[in-house]
């Protein structure tokens, strides 16, 4: 059984360690610059807390660098002199490629393993990560690592290093930017004079029902609203009512919805809707919008 260690005892390293252990991989332990963090992660994985990174490296076959993106190169340079033939060094960054591993010693393999999952705690339930997909970047196309990782039972896909940053941007659209959209919506609710205690939760059934429909049935089936219905006056009124800094955001996202609507309803002529949204892209009449709001 492969012996696994983690340099970095934060939420990602801790959750992965717990998950690997639940799948009968041998987790040897953790090293972190804060011994308390190493000890806490070791407790959660029934493993060891190491006081030196070199000692952890010596005890493991697979070493995961579960540190922030900006710290990867520094940690790599620290452990590189201690590596030996047959070891595999992983990072878990969605944005960084294997290029961060410079001057790889002969006989050492490198790999990245990125879970498509929002991890908020190392102690969170394993239910979500059991369903999560992972992307893998391999230094060696014929590597046996992919076969070994398939033992986790998760969906796996190989990604080229040159595509990592665009891939990570896509992940941000699926996760982080959604939070920004929700914040934007609640701000608009409050601007309408709705009470804060109402706006804090009123959007949740709408959001969750829509998200569930999207996941279960796909974008075309889930799409509703004025763009799909080709409600020209409603979309125009939206653009006039929104603050200037939100008009562009509404327009960009609506053009994506328009593409889906056109695929869903090829019998509908959306040319006027396209014109309205195209006009917004080329500079919506914000002076008119200001007059309307007054």
Residues covered by each model-derived region:
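NAD(P)+-binding Rossmann beta1-loop-alpha1 motif at the extreme N-terminus of oxidoreductases
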Residues: 1-55
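Internal alpha-helical scaffold of NAD(P)-dependent oxidoreductase catalytic cores
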Residues: 26, 40-44, 103, 109, ...
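Interdomain hinge/lid region at the active-site interface
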Residues: 212-269
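NAD(P)-dependent dehydrogenase/reductase Rossmann-like domain
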Residues: 260-261, 265-294
């Amino acid at each position: 059984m492969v012996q696994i260690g983690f340099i970095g005892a934060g939420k990602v390293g801790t959750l992965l360690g717990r998950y690997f252990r639940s799948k009968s991989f041998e987790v040897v332990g953790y090293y972190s610059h804060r011994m308390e963090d190493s000890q806490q992660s070791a407790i959660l994985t029934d493993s060891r807390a190491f006081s030196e990174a070199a000692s952890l490296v010596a005890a493991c076959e697979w070493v995961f660098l579960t540190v922030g993106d900006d710290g990867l190169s520094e940690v790599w340079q620290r452990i590189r002199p201690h590596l030996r033939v047959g070891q595999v060094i992983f990072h878990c960054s969605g944005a960084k490629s294997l290029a961060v591993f410079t001057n790889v010693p002969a006989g050492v393999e490198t790999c990245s393993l990125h879970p498509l999952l929002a991890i908020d705690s190392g102690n969170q339930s394993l239910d979500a990560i059991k369903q999560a997909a992972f992307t893998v970047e391999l230094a060696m196309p014929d590597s046996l690592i992919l076969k070994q990782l398939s033992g986790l039972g998760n969906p796996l896909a190989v990604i080229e290093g040159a595509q990592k940053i665009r891939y990570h941007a896509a992940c941000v659209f699926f996760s982080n930017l959604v939070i920004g959209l929700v914040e934007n919506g609640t701000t608009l609710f409050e601007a309408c004079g709705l009470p804060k205690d109402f706006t804090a939760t009123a959007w949740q059934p709408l959001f969750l029902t829509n998200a569930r429909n999207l996941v279960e049935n796909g974008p075309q089936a889930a799409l509703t609203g004025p763009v799909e219905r080709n409600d020209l006056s409603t979309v125009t009124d939206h653009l006039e009512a929104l603050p200037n800094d939100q008009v562009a955001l509404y327009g960009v996202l609506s053009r994506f919805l328009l593409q889906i609507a056109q695929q869903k309803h090829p019998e509908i002529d959306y040319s006027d809707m396209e014109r309205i949204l195209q006009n917004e892209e080329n500079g919506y009449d914000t002076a008119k919008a200001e007059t309307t709001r007054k």
